[in-house]
Amino acid sequence: MMRKYLKQLSLTLSLIIAGALAGCGFTPLHSTGGAATSLADIDIALNKGSSVVDNQAGFFVLQRVRDRIGTASDASPYRLEITPRYRRRRLGLTSGDVASRYDITVTANWTLVDAKTGKKLERGSTESTVSFGAPDGPFGVITADNVGVEQTAKETADKLIIDLARYFSSDKAQAVK
């Protein structure tokens, strides 16, 4: 008896939720049409950073964005320009002025451009920070820093994709189309 009641209750709740989602205009990000189609039509350009590590972080951001949204066709209607920035900050200094922890921050300043007209459609900045304990020895710090840059850049790229999806699902993007 109780099972039958729970089954009816779950079916009723499922129908109510489905109706509410259909009524609110909810569109899944990866569905056909909508933001997913627009994300697949973006040509990505990486602007040079001011340092080698900026460029390394930019490379990881670029690779992650391409992995997530794919590579664009030759006639892409949009161009995404990304300018990377890397910062490492020492934390937890010992009495010998040696850091025991580091924070790595990767920032991606981006601009979405209409490829035909050159008009700037949207711009933003995404940032992520990763902390790591400093291993003993200089090579351990270098290795940990390299891994930290890659992890932080991937997280930054994921946030950038969310910002782009938010733009393409907005009324502002629909007015441009």
Predicted regions mapped to residue ranges:
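Short linear motifs at secondary-structure transitions and domain/linker junctions
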Residues: I17-A22, V53-F60, L80-R89, Y102-D103, ...
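Short secondary-structure transition/capping segments
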Residues: L6, L11, H30, K119-F132, ...
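C-terminal/domain-edge helix-coil "capping" segments
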Residues: D136, G140-K177
